Every structure is written in structure tokens, then in C-alpha cells.
Amino acid sequence: MNIKFITIKVKNLEESINFYKEILGLKDIRRINPMGGTKIAFLEDKNSGTIELIENEEISKTYDVSKESMVSIGFEVKNINEKIDELKNKKINIIRGPIEVPGGSKLAFIKDPNGIEIEFIEENR
């Protein structure tokens, strides 16, 4: 069994697409408008799964994803310090890290435009 995709409800689809493409390097593979007021984009990582971003005009007016969501997304990186430098060069705020955890793995955290926590993990191998 493999994870096919992760769905995230977003406030602004275009802003979210740009973040996931420009900051995280995901590829925009498909967009659909299945019904009035709903827009969906699928983005993928070349090595793993797909992220589905959904903007719904009615939900966006009342739903505060940053307060109600328990979603976080983790990406494995080869070098946490290089990733932190890359993010800082793109003017992205590092909210925590680098943190070394028992076992030697290193972590750093940012947030996407919707308040979703993004974790970068350098595994100790």
C-alpha cells in the first residue's frame, strides 16, 4: 500500500500553489474545477506522493485552517543546514530548528501560507 495523496484545504489556491512550487520544489501536475466555487490543484514530488490543494469560496470565508487543522507535512532532506539557508534566501521564516533529536536526526520547521506546518528532516543514517 502507498499513500496516493494528501489533501489540504487552502484559503488562496494560487498563493498556495506558488509556495509549494517555488519554496518546496513541487511540480504542478493538474488543475480541475469540479463544481462552482471549488478549485483543485495537484502537485507532486518527484520521489514520493501528491499534495491536493482545494480552495472552496464558501469554506474559505469561515474556515481558519491555521486554527483548526492538525495537518503537517514532512520532507526528508540530505542536509538540514543547506535547506535552512535555501529557505532563508527565499525569505521564509524558520519557526523552529535546526533541532537535533535523540538518535541524531535533525529537524527544522516552517509554515505555508495557510498555517500548515512543514517539517524538514535530515535522518541520521
Language-model segments: which ranges?
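N-terminal beta-strand motif that seeds the catalytic metal site of vicinal oxygen chelate
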Residues: 1-17, 70-73, 124
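A short, acidic/glycine-rich surface segment
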Residues: 38-39, 58-63, 96
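Exposed loop/turn and edge beta-strand positions of beta-sandwich/beta-sheet ligand-binding modules
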Residues: 37, 69, 104
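Hydrophobic side chains in well-ordered alpha-helices
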Residues: 16-19, 83-87
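Vicinal oxygen chelate
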Residues: 31, 42, 84-125
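Acetyl-CoA-dependent GNAT
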Residues: 55-59, 122-125
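Mid-chain, well-packed structural core segment of small domains
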Residues: 72-84
